Amino acid sequence: MRLPMNTSLATLKPSGIRRINALAAQHPGCIALALGEPDFPTPDVISAEVTAALDRGDTHYPPNNGRPALRDALSKYMDDAGLAFSADEVILTDGATEALSATFMAMLNPGDEVIIPTPAFGLYESIVVANHAKAVFLDTEPAQFQIDEDALRACVTPATKAIVICSPNNPTGCILNAASLDAVARVAEQAGIYVVCDDVYNRLVYVDGYERFAQRHPELREQTVIIESFSKPWSMTGWRLGWLAAAAPVIAEIAKAHQYLVSSAVSFEMDAAARALTVDPTPMLEVYRTRREHVLAALDAMGLDVVEPAGAFYTFPSIKQFGLTSEDFCIKAIKEANVALVPGDCFGTEGHVRLSYCVSDKDLDEGLTRLSNFVSTL
């Protein structure tokens, strides 16, 4: 007899990104332009702090929210970016994924709704649904991946609890402009909803004038939750370290969820995390910038339309001209050209694919050549 499980999870599917990578792994020599993982090693000065911590036996329970010295460092790091949060308003988390999980666990009641502008990382919907709430999708493609205020207002209901925004965006690489940020602020203030900012790519920006929501709208501090990560700027994806910041009354509730989800982040990584905050990620950013230009030129030569990314390390070209679903396109590309991309429907937007350029220059060159040859046959 099969006993019942959580019915909220019945509609959830395993990550489409991981599924594509698993399929690519079955094809020897396949070039994977799919995962959003930097191809650089973690800087040595960061890794050395873990060795030192282990040598001195730093393997015991730390404070749930992270050591005070690290939270002080995170507070100062954010202050330097124009974001005023005290050390007591910061929690070190097991990656940005856990930060998002704890945030929504603390925030949502059954039947609440969260607005998710699409395309968006599929994790948002999964966490919302797992917490017995409803994801409401706002299609941003008609606005060139910006947020149209009228369209946003049409998504708001009495059940709306929050909106989650990601800028620079995964999968488009686009950043929200001032008009989009202001639209979110007006609607959030008038509707009385939270703004959850997934800012994990904020150090990977290629244009001037980039503003984060909390920088532009500090007056909504009490309604804003900021999610950050060590993974992307410092190539620390396997470390599973992130943090979140929010006003004291909000952080107090999120801290409860964090405590019972994971207890704490890893003790012997905390000094390394503090050290990472002092490391300038610009050298990696400049490599991504060069790759970005290479990718955009290659996509243009292939005749693929794309909204130029201003940050992160993704492009999201349209494949509508080929009359294939994004899933069929990507499976066909793996089987026929040995190159892996991510279907746009994994992000809630059909007719596009995500191409990641955080791979070696050699793999990027070969992957683009294979993709070009592939689309020429369609």
Which residues make up each language-model segment?
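PLP-dependent class I/II
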Residues: R2-M5, A10-T11, L23-Q26, I31, ...
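Glycine-rich loop-to-alpha-helix module at the N-terminal edge of alpha/beta enzyme cores
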Residues: G57-T59, A73-A81
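Intrinsically disordered, tyrosine-centered linear signaling motifs in cytosolic regions
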Residues: H60-Y61, Y201
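Short beta-strand to alpha-helix junction loop
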Residues: N65-G66
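Conserved helicase/translocase P-loop NTPase motor core
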Residues: L70-R71, L100
